[in-house]
Every structure is written in C-alpha cells, then in structure tokens.
Amino acid sequence: MQMANRPAGDPTLSRHVRRATRADAGAMQRLLRMGVYVHVHVDWHLPGDWLGTPGFVVYTRGDDSPGERVAACLGIGADPLPAAWVRVAAVESAAAFAQCEAMWTAIVADLDPDIEEVAWFVTDNWPLHWLDRLGLEPVSTVLSFRKGDLTAAPYTPPPGLDIRPALIEELPLLAEMEAAAFEPRWRHSAQSLYLAWRQSLSFDVALLDGQPVGFQFSTGGGGGAHLARMTVQPERQGQGIGAALLARALEGYRQRKLRGVTLNTQADNLASQRLYERFGFAPTGHEYPVWSYYPTPG
C-alpha cells in the first residue's frame, strides 16, 4: 500500500494533528461507531489496515500522548499509485469542518510525489458540504443496477474461450490488465486482487489460447450477489468476453441459490451499461458522486 504523506497545516490547528498509530485503533473504532459524520471507503481493505501509515492522521484534544482524546480521523491511501482514495473519515461533532480541514491540510501539504489524484467516493450527503471548500471537484458518478432474477441473455463468445476460477499466480497479470483497461482511480493492484481472491464469492478468469483476457469477481450477502468487478482486456472488448463472464457469474449465483444481483458502473461507461441492460439489469436510482483533488505538479 502506498500512502499520501508528510503532515503539515494551519499553524493554529496543526498542533492538534498527528499521524495515527496502531495505538489509536480503539479511538478509531469509537469514532466509526459513534461519530456524527463517518465515511469508510468500500473495498477489500479494512480501516485499521491503514493505521500507522503516512497519510492517516488524527485530530486530538489534550496532550500529544496516544491516550489523549481523538476527536476526528482522516486516512488517504493509494493502492495502486498514482491515484489515492480517502479511505476513512470520521468526526465526533457536526461542527468539525475546521478539524477536517486541518487534517486534510496536513495530508496534502506534502503528498507522495507519485500521487496524481486523491478521490472521495461519496456515499452520504454530508461530505458534499465540505468537499468544495477542501479543494475537491466532481469528476465522475457511479450508478447502481439490479437484476431480480439470474437468467442470462443470449450471447456468442469468441471461439476457444475458456472460463475457470482464477489462480493466485495470475493476479499480477490481471493487475496489468486493470492498468490497461481503467484510468488510475478505478484500478486494483495485485495486492487488492489478492484480497478479493481470498474473500470473494467467485473469482473467474477468461482465457484465449491460454492467456487471460478478462475476469470477474463477486461478493454475496443477504441472500443475493454483487458483481464487484468486470474487466476485459481493452483490445478484446466488444468480442463477447464480458457477456460470457457475466453469464458464468449468473450461473454460479444460481448454483448457490442466491436471489438477485446488484452491480455498480460509471455513468460514462456506456458499453458496460448496454451489456448489463441487455442481461436484464435496471438502474436502482442510486447514484454516487466521485470528487477528486489534483495536487499541483512540482
């Protein structure tokens, strides 16, 4: 994992900001449970995974010992570079913008020079009152889709296509495929793919002539499935590989006797939306904006 780093900030508030340590785990959990405003980035990492890394800071009241009162926390991490996400944010007071601003200033004052973007996946309304003031701007929207049954639409796969469960040794190749297929903020690293491989409901790879050309992984919960990722090698897109992977995923859900499936996709990814709608997915009406901060080069 790569993290944004080097705390610094407003001279009147920066003295309250320090890097989070493993000793802050209990305070962080308290904030996540009891905080007025809480954000946790949804992926395969847990919030505690980022403790002790540069870019995860806390705002404290009292002295500088690990036992002082932690009033807020903010963690930013890149996995992989060059884009970072806001991984966790929590404050115990609704009037805590100044605290958040001090933590944000501390983090972005001296980011890892390889970080080109810091993005916030907005799942609640409260960050929208702060993001513009912190210097972020809206860059994308994620749409949610749902399918109430698990039937597959007719499709024609390319000759010789084979789909099977992914092997751990294939994950670095799949990470390279991610880098080729997506802009930085949406990519998974080999480490993130490993976490998905360990925890997912299904993780399938599509092969042509023995070489990976696409993959999907899914999660389950509440009696349903969630298609968490679908990636196809850019030069192979439009050849039926995504449809074949989707059909195989639906077959796996049926075998597990799941009921329905959800997925998310970017509003500007029209090709994926056409595929999902052809398979019977419909928009749920839920939309999630993405805001980003772009450090000034140099």
Where are these regions (language model features)?
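Acyl-donor-binding surface of acyltransferase catalytic domains
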Residues: 1-8, 78-82, 91-159, 289-291
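C-terminal "cap" of GNAT-fold acetyltransferases
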Residues: 143-161, 259, 264-270, 282, ...
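Flexible, substrate/cofactor-facing loop regions flanked by secondary structure
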Residues: 38-44, 157-225
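Conserved hydrophobic beta-strand within the GNAT/NAT acetyltransferase core sheet
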Residues: 118-121, 227, 261-265
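Conserved active-site alpha-helix within GNAT-family acetyltransferase domains
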Residues: 122-140, 239, 243, 267-285
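Conserved acetyl-CoA-binding loop-helix of GNAT-fold acetyltransferases
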Residues: 95-109, 232, 238-251, 255, ...
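A short beta-loop-alpha structural element at the N-terminal edge
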Residues: 8-28, 162-174
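Conserved donor-binding loop and adjoining core beta-sheet/short helix segment
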Residues: 33-36, 43-104, 216-228, 233
